[in-house]
């Protein structure tokens, strides 16, 4: 598995961060590269009971031997970047991070426009992080790049070059996606989408990896999908039902309450197909079956949980390789050896 990509299969907030964190520690990749849109998506991980949330830097930061990279396709907010360098100082991130010199900069004006635009903020439900306006300026070829900012000079690199050289040397490369397939500008429920494609193909392009150099694609699904902001959500349940089932969540970036729904097998199959999934990861199985909490051996899962995993594999047509049964890093079942 010289290179693999982890992407969300629903509308974001699938728990990609917890899967990426596990892979970063367990598999020990030498390079961890982040693709995706920008600072409009947050990944949360729990390490020794402490919660860390990142919006700009790779979620695999806790692997202190890995080179951390942010691909050319990612938007960079200097304010968020430097905040996270300080936030993660215990992990020596500052000495390991590289930004592709071609990344577009999110400027204060982009954030102001994002938050003040009635259409984006009201109808679409933007996070207000400035990503949409920044990508618009990029498409118009008038945006700044990180190479234009002196304060970012120490961190500049050619991410595509680094990643491909690492692959040439047989190193393990982990690529992180952000948000989810259902928010893709191309394949999501337009116009209630993000400002670019979020599929595995796009994430590979973000960091400069050609399609023939991707060995595995892990698509992450949450047992009860969630969505922040407006847009179609066919299996959505009522807020009252979500409260009764203990499924109330709030967005990492926006703080807004997430809409909750039942697992949509048809959408999951479509998502896995377009992303080219070779493996699936299922998170928050303990929310589906509370007796599954903390279980690390598949054979010890309660039957209800086993049946749910079997149904996903049958209806989606892709094997489930990783199962999260709780918030901590060690709350996971790894079935990759059986695939």
UniProtKB/Swiss-Prot annotation:
Q: Where in the cell is it found?
A: Cytoplasm
Q: Which gene encodes it?
A: purA
Query: Which family does the record assign?
Result: Belongs to the adenylosuccinate synthetase family.
The membrane spanning regions, by residue number, are none
Briefly, what is this protein's role? Answer: Plays an important role in the de novo pathway of purine nucleotide biosynthesis. Catalyzes the first committed step in the biosynthesis of AMP from IMP.
A Pfam family in this protein? Adenylsucc_synt
Kindly give the HAMAP family that the UniProt entry links to this protein: Adenylosucc_synth (MF_00011)
The note on cofactor binding and number reads:
Binds 1 Mg(2+) ion per subunit.
SUPFAM superfamilies listed in its UniProt record: P-loop containing nucleoside triphosphate hydrolases
NCBIfam families noted in UniProt: PRK04293.1
Q: Give the taxonomic lineage as stored in the record.
A: Archaea, Methanobacteriati, Methanobacteriota, Thermococci, Thermococcales
Q: Which residues make up the binding site for substrate? A: 252-258
Query: Which GO terms of the cellular component aspect does the record hold?
Result: cytoplasm
Q: Which organism is it from?
A: Thermococcus sibiricus (strain DSM 12597 / MM 739)
**Gene3D superfamilies in the cross-refs:** Adenylosuccinate Synthetase, subunit A, domain 1 (3.40.440.10), Adenylosuccinate Synthetase, subunit A, domain 3 (3.90.170.10)
Question: What protein name applies here?
Answer: Adenylosuccinate synthetase
């Amino acid at each position: 598995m010289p290179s693999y990509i982890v992407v969300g299969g629903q509308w974001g907030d699938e728990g990609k961060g917890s899967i990426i964190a596990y892979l970063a520690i367990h598999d020990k990749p030498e390079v961890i590269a982040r693709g995706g849109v920008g600072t409009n998506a947050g990944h949360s991980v729990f390490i020794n009971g402490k919660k860390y949330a990142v919006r700009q830097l790779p979620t695999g930061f806790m692997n202190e031997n890995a080179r951390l990279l942010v691909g050319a396709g990612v938007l960079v907010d200097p304010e968020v970047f430097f905040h996270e360098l300080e936030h993660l100082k215990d992990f020596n991130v500052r000495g390991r991070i590289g930004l592709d010199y071609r990344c577009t900069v999110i400027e204060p004006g982009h954030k102001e426009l994002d938050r003040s635009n009635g259409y984006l903020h009201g109808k679409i439900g933007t996070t207000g992080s400035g990503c949409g306006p920044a990508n618009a300026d990029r498409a118009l070829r008038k945006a700044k790049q990180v190479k234009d900012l002196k304060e970012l000079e120490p961190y500049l690199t050619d991410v595509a070059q680094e990643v491909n050289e690492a692959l040439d040397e047989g190193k393990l490369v982990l690529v992180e996606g952000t948000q989810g397939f259902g928010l893709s500008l191309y394949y999501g429920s337009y116009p209630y989408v993000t400002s670019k494609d979020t599929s595995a193909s796009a994430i590979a392009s973000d960091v400069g990896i050609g399609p023939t150099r991707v060995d595995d694609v892990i698509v992450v699904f949450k047992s009860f999908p969630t969505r922040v902001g407006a847009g179609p959500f066919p299996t959505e349940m009522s807020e009252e039902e979500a409260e009764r089932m203990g499924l109330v969540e709030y967005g990492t970036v926006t703080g807004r309450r997430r809409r909750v729904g039942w697992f949509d097998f048809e959408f999951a199959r479509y998502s896995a197909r377009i992303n080219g999934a070779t493996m699936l990861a299922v998170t928050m199985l303990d929310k589906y079956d509370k007796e599954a909490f903390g279980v690390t051996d598949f054979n010890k899962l309660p039957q209800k949980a086993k049946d749910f995993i079997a149904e996903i594999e049958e209806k989606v047509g892709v094997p489930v390789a990783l199962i999260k049964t709780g918030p901590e890093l060690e709350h996971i079942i790894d079935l990759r050896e059986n695939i």
